[in-house]
């Protein structure tokens, strides 16, 4: 099952701030997830889909949905290696990832809309760093700091890899997260 998505909008104002992501760019979170998945596998971009397979009540596969390639990005391996290494270094600097049993690569981002609202928090990532199988993108509107988005992604990885139980992660109350635990954006 393919998901139709909105076309991304590239910034058309403020050339210098736009260069670092502070312009009028407009991307969906799922579009960013597809982007980071393309980065994780060094250039293969897939169509978005929400189903892996359809099974009956006994677990028999009725239909298997094979990912479809949308396009590829051809870069020299040295560039891909530099990108992967840089994204790994971003996460290595985050203290709240120190005890995670899986290596994650990611990129933080804090988008400033205006001075009357809190910044938007963003974190795109993939794991395991050595052989990617999952990407996670978190955007928190008016979330103040990308560290909050990165800590939320950490919890997704904990759940996905069975490192924490759902009850430990979903408590029904908001967590007090530590914006000083990372090194900032």
Locate each region found by the language model:
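Intrinsically disordered, low-complexity acidic/polar segments
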Residues: 133, 145-147, 163
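Short, surface-exposed, charged/polar-biased interaction segments
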Residues: 53-57, 104, 145, 157, ...
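Beta-lactam-recognizing serine transpeptidase/beta-lactamase-like catalytic domain environment
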Residues: 1-141, 181-185
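Short, gly/Ser/Thr-rich active-site loops of penicillin-recognizing serine hydrolases
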Residues: 61-68, 154-185
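Short, charged, low-complexity patches
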Residues: 32, 145-154
